[in-house]
Amino acid sequence: MNSKCHCVILNDGNFIPVLGFGTALPLECPKSKAKELTKIAIDAGFHHFDSASVYNTEDHVGEAIRSKIADGTVRREDIFYTSKVWCTSLHPELVRASLERSLQKLQFDYVDLYLIHYPMALKPGEENFPVDEHGKLIFDRVDLCATWEAMEKCKDAGLTKSIGVSNFNYRQLEMILNKPGLKYKPVCNQVECHPYLNQMKLLDFCKSKDIVLVAYGVLGTQRYGGWVDQNSPVLLDEPVLGSMAKKYNRTPALIALRYQLQRGIVVLNTSLKEERIKENMQVFEFQLSSEDMKVLDGLNRNMRYIPAAIFKGHPNWPFLDEY
């Protein structure tokens, strides 16, 4: 890790800040809240922002970043911005248009990282979640290798500096890596990862291929109704995190964040509270002992908060495999 900017280098030579701010909001939250939170995060020291077309917040996030550039707080080159192509735009001919729509909303010339959001195609169209008359998602089939070639073209066109994937299992990653004529490897795989789902095998696989693991849901998310079983155990109530928080004089959230950073994982965190956003920057101020890291490893129970259950039955549903 480059400690000056708290960055790691990607396999294409670009750098990614190891702590990012996620801009997905719970349904009950007005999307305009993303603008306020992004400004708070920039003022707190965040330079890495993770978004996606399906979040419907890119116009607000872009406005916040542009206002902070205009007032001299940051420069565009100080910001690392990630967007993602949604499942309805995975046909190769739709990928660039999706990225261009995001750029239009952001009023940016480029994004720093563009990801395939899920390896599962849905019927193309205006609806993000197209359903049939029975309310079932309308699945589609697409050659993900062809989708990847369209991603490579976006990089060549200068619309994104780096390209990667999200929610891919190791077999789906291998399919891209083994693609004949591969021009660019995915720089990262963004997946759910926290002490209850530590992704040890996927992390080892990604490291062996020089692919960075980016973690979302690092504090165990309870907020996304419809996506998360609200009866799931609350990660931050885990007694081990509580006792370590006392030992290091930090919060359980900071222990969970620090755990991932020390494993070489890039961490995304979202908070709706200003004091929490600022507090999360303290993750660089302390270090967990190797003994405590082993204890945290022992919390794994392969438990997903976000199993993308609405996609179950899709031929490319990634979570059937062990990793």
Swiss-Prot record:
User: What are the site positions for Lowers pKa of active site Tyr?
Assistant: K84
Biological process according to GO: steroid biosynthetic process; steroid metabolic process
CC per GO annotation: cytoplasm
- The protein in question is named Aldo-keto reductase family 1 member C21
* Localization, UniProt: Cytoplasm
Which keywords annotate this record?
Cytoplasm, Lipid metabolism, NADP, Oxidoreductase, Steroid metabolism
Q: Which PANTHER family match?
A: ALDO/KETO REDUCTASE
What InterPro entries does the database record attribute to this sequence? AKR, AKR1C, Aldo/ket_reductase_CS, NADP_OxRdtase_dom, NADP_OxRdtase_dom_sf
Which residues of this UniProt protein bind NADP(+)?
Answer: 20-24, 50, 166-167, 190, 216-224, 270-280
Instruction: Indicate the family of this protein.
Output: Belongs to the aldo/keto reductase family.
Catalytic reaction list? androsterone + NADP(+) = 5alpha-androstan-3,17-dione + NADPH + H(+); androsterone + NAD(+) = 5alpha-androstan-3,17-dione + NADH + H(+)
CDD domains linked: AKR_AKR1C1-35 (cd19108)
Subunit record text: Monomer.
Gene Ontology molecular functions? 17-beta-hydroxysteroid dehydrogenase (NADP+) activity; 5-alpha-androstane-3-beta,17-beta-diol dehydrogenase (NADP+) activity; aldo-keto reductase (NADPH) activity; androsterone dehydrogenase [NAD(P)+] activity; lithocholic acid binding; NADP+ binding; NADPH binding; steroid binding
Enzyme Commission code(s) on record: 1.1.1.-, 1.1.1.209
